[in-house]
Design a protein with these regions (language model features):
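Conserved, compact domain cores that house catalytic/ligand-binding motifs in diverse enzymes
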Residues: 272-273
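Active-site-proximal flexible loops/turns
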Residues: 36
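An acidic-aromatic substrate-binding cleft motif
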Residues: 33
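Disordered extramembrane loops and terminal tails of multipass alpha-helical membrane proteins
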Residues: 1-30, 39, 52-54, 58-60, ...
């Protein structure tokens, strides 16, 4: 036991003097540190998108959670694997230098980034919700408080304002609950329940001869399924391009390190990407998305539950805009890496021209002796 402790202490004492110089060398490696900045920014954007994509598909296109997750698995995950494979195959075949690899990664990634902006046009408007997105008279408004859920048509009903039990009126408007729709009677049971004599539907500014409502939110626009397919196809292409650029980018990381620094450098790179991107990005993405919530649910114990209704326009701009901002900033250190590598390449080429290889010098001497 004593021998083991001495051996362990000796290893520790021999490790620390070697570790500090390597760590110092890594922190003074400009390409390596810039690459870590790029990774943190790009991975933060990617992690935020993938974490909240199921929720985005639910809110924007009206898909269920299971359908949203299934769609992501079908459209996004396979092409990421294919992109990594072809990226590695491409780099193996063409045997590029570090500057060429960085150039390829930059332009491929930039093309995917520009294509990403086309997702802003895959829009699906939600059905109006009385007291949240429109007034009970049918006028649009953006400000929301619990008082806006009350109107003259339901003021005398003593409705609970924190309950989320939506019903769809015959006028195409969703109401937070049958009580807030002013419904006086119901027929049927379970999913087939129909609420009748709904005073708020009758008093709304929408033309409707009926004053009944059914369980659930009203359906979204007819073009929502088409827009969903457009969004998923664009997401598929962007995911493929993103993964295609990853392999040449990783080659830049590896080649920027000396052989004795690679194991430590790769480890610190992985640690930084998880500590500064993998952990915090879902937190601040979630906090920002929560600011777009219009109606919070209530737990059985009375506490605040999950968000039931979002302002989908603000949600869309935050969900798509924040990754665009992070990725856009990541191209600043990318440009600096290209400039540094280009300068190194020119410097090495000038040295070769000034000091030709030994074989070339020997051949020139032989040619001189033959003359």
């Amino acid at each position: 036991m004593i021998h083991f402790r001495k051996h362990h202490t000796n290893l520790l004492h021999s490790f620390i003097p070697d570790f500090i110089p390597y760590l110092k060398a890594l922190f003074h490696n400009r390409v390596y540190m810039l690459f870590i900045c790029i990774t943190v920014l790009q991975f933060s954007a990617f992690n935020g998108i993938m974490t909240f994509m199921p929720k985005y598909l639910e809110q924007q296109f009206g898909k269920s959670a299971s359908d949203a997750i299934f769609s992501i698995g079908i459209y996004n995950l396979p092409v990421v694997c294919i992109g990594y494979f072809f990226g590695g195959l491409f780099m193996k075949k063409f045997k590029t230098n570090t500057f060429q690899a960085a150039n390829i990664a930059f332009w491929i990634s930039l093309s995917g980034y520009l294509l990403y902006f086309s997702t802003y046009w895959t829009i699906c408007d939600a059905s109006p919700v009385a007291g949240l997105t429109v007034s009970y008279e049918g006028r649009e408004h953006v400000s929301y408080t619990e008082n806006t859920l009350l109107a003259g048509c339901n003021n005398d009903c003593n409705c609970a304002l924190k309950i989320w039990d939506p019903v769809c009126g015959d006028n195409g408007v969703t109401y937070v609950s049958p009580c807030l729709a002013g419904c006086k009677a119901s027929t049927g049971t379970g999913k087939h329940m129909v609420f009748e004599n709904c005073t708020c539907i009758a008093a709304s500014g929408f033309s409707s001869q009926n004053v009944s409502a059914i369980l659930g939110q009203c359906d979204k626009e007819e073009n929502c399924d088409k827009m969903l397919h457009y969004y998923l196809i664009l997401s598929l292409v962007c995911s493929f391009i993103f993964s295609l650029s990853a392999t040449p980018g990783y080659m830049v990381l590896i080649r920027s390190l000396k052989p004795e620094e690679k194991s430590l450098g790769v480890g610190i790179h992985g640690l930084a990407s998880r500590v500064f991107a993998g952990i915090p990005s879902p937190i601040y993405f979630g906090a920002l998305i929560d600011t777009t919530c219009l109606k919070w649910g209530t737990k059985s114990c009375g506490g605040e539950g999950a968000c039931r209704m979002y302002d989908i326009v603000t949600y869309r701009w935050l969900y798509l805009g924040l990754p665009a901002l992070l990725r856009g900033v990541s191209y600043i250190p990318s440009v600096f890496i290209l400039l540094i590598l280009k300068k190194k390449l020119k410097s090495s080429e000038s040295k070769v021209l000034m000091n030709p290889p030994v074989e070339m010098q020997t051949k020139e001497e032989e040619n001189e002796s033959l003359k």
